[in-house]
């Protein structure tokens, strides 16, 4: 049975040019990968609500072992989403505002 609804063309290159931005695509993919676990998203949200927090305080917010939180923090730090400053035997974490602004801009441009 054929549909009487007209379907739009599948891909018309003249309709809208494709804006190829490989560097931005790579950065967005890296940031999304870093946020690819719900606990990491929660850590970033928690840090956005605070100015800075020690790793132990962050670990208290999640139902996982401190060592697991440490791994999540490393992923976020490696992607540049958070920064950690050593304070004696502890590390104090804060959100990298520039990286979050970049993430928001890149997601908004999708």
What would you call each of these model-derived segments?
Residues 78-87, 94:
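Beta-hairpin "wing" of winged helix-turn-helix
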Residues 60, 77-78:
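Alpha-helical residues within the helix-turn-helix
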